[in-house]
Amino acid sequence: MIIHPNFDPVAIHLGPLAVRWYGLMYLVGFIFAIVVGRLRLKLPHVAAQGWSAKDIDDMMFYGVLGVVLGGRLGYVLFYKAGYYFSHPLDIFRVWEGGMSFHGGFLGVTLAMALFAWQRKRHWLEVTDFVAPMVPTGLAAGRLGNFINGELWGRVTSPDAPWAMLFPGASRDDAAWLAAHQDIAAKWNLNEVFLSHQMLPRHPSQLYEIALEGIALFFVLWFFSRKPRPMGAISALFLIGYGAARFTVEFAREPDDFLGLLTFGLSMGQWLSLPMIVAGVLMMIWAYRRGGVAKQA
């Protein structure tokens, strides 16, 4: 078993100002997105559409607003609506954590629609350009989760080579042990807990980095290197992210204030299913429609 390094959540101290790893990873994610966007400008069919470095900079401005506002509001509405309706001022305490990818996705979608309207471009032209830029940012965000030792995975066998002990999960581990003595006996977890005061869990943040970040990036990057029907790249992102998130959720610990919902699925899985369905329908529509994005 591997013990989580238990990093200091503060990366840099600047006098009274503390720069946290999670916020730093958001910055890294946006930088990666800009780099990927500029690399895409070198593709002939992308350059022919009239995209420029200034467009990328403007997109990132809209994207930051969409991620922060949408991610926070999504977390408030999808995960802890009851709490925040009772404590509305806590909605603004973003530094304490609490962001939702699906909310951020909706926020960015609306932000890109506004960008497209201002630039007189079709909305799907914009999302097709942006889609391959997103996974590297997702990977950076999940790395921030791992550094913080949060959003850990479900309990697993101590014999699994990837099993990890998360100090922050010790209280949850004790509650899990009391409720699952049948599995604990099968995996000798009582002995593990007596020795470490923790239980082995899946490092699900790393799974998400691998699937939602690295794998999805390469799939989108190679798919988008050739001209595709308008909407196809966006559709592949919806399918790829939705499928990756749905899969990883089987190893990720459900939110304690929600648990598992209908059919034993988590909130993340229920929010991912519409993405997959929408992506499949959009892909069919894109190829039936035919053609590629217009040139400038």
Swiss-Prot record:
Bilayer topology term: Multi-pass membrane protein
Transmembrane segments: 17-37, 59-79, 97-117, 230-250, 265-285
GO cellular component, one term: plasma membrane
Main location: membrane
GO BP terms in the entry: lipoprotein biosynthetic process
Subcellular location as annotated: Cell inner membrane
GO MF, one example: phosphatidylglycerol-prolipoprotein diacylglyceryl transferase activity
Pfam families hit by this protein: LGT
Intrachain disulfide bonds: none
Enzyme class: transferase
Lineage top rank: taxon: Bacteria
Pathway field: Protein modification; lipoprotein biosynthesis (diacylglyceryl transfer)
E.C. no: 2.5.1.145
Function: Catalyzes the transfer of the diacylglyceryl group from phosphatidylglycerol to the sulfhydryl group of the N-terminal cysteine of a prolipoprotein, the first step in the formation of mature lipoproteins.
Annotated HAMAP family: Lgt
Family per record: Belongs to the Lgt family.
Entry protein name: Phosphatidylglycerol--prolipoprotein diacylglyceryl transferase
Organism of provenance: Burkholderia pseudomallei (strain 668)
